[in-house]
Amino acid sequence: MSFLVMGSLNYDYIYSLDHIVAPGETIASAKLDKACGGKGFNQAAALAKAGAKVYLAGLVGADKDQMLETAQEFGVDCRFVQERDNATGHAIIQVDKNGQNSIVLFGGTNRMWTAEYVDSVLDSFEKGDVLILQNEINGIEDILEKAYARGISIVLNPSPFEDCILSWQLEKISLFFINEVEGSQMTQKSEPKDILDQMLFQYPDA
């Protein structure tokens, strides 16, 4: 059994500030950190650290080297990662002295997935393998249908949540990764037990 993560690859630019910048304000940053992230990258790295054989599929720009080197250091197989003529997705993160943050996301290459690229990746996987998805790339509905047709088990983290997710063929999902916020958005319930009960009612096969 192989694990395939099809997802976002981001560079996180983290600025340490006295306070979150206000409209029209210019302030100096005390520190800048750059890290590899994106839900796809993070999930692949976590699986690899847990000892799984995991493949990562995603799109990056010409500044790909740090991303690939870091993923490979975790033990992630990056053979399916491809370069595109755009900037790698990134996040600008402001963190104030109290730990509060503000985040601006740029999708970049994460929004350049095509049906041809999806096919080229899924052709290397088969029934019994596991696909892990999030909602930071485009074309998720197409990926769901094609993976399901191949007999691949599908795990979905519906984050960031959008109402359109509820129109996807979610009965094809084998397992949901959700937190309390996403669960509430999926079910319109607020209490954890009610969220779980409603998820089981809506998706009894997951």
Which residue stretches match the model-derived regions?
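Short gly/ser/thr-rich secondary-structure transition/capping motifs
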Residues: 75, 111-116, 155-161
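Short acidic active-site motifs
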Residues: 117-120, 139-143, 163-166, 194-195
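Conserved phosphate/ATP/ADP-binding segment of small-molecule kinases
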Residues: 149-155, 159-206
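Positively charged, low-complexity intrinsically disordered leader regions
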Residues: 1-23
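Substrate-binding N-lobe of the ribokinase-like
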Residues: 3, 23-90
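Conserved phosphate-binding/catalytic loop of the ribokinase/pfkB sugar-kinase fold
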Residues: 56, 81-83, 93-130
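Surface-exposed amphipathic alpha-helices with a cationic face
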Residues: 48, 141-151, 200
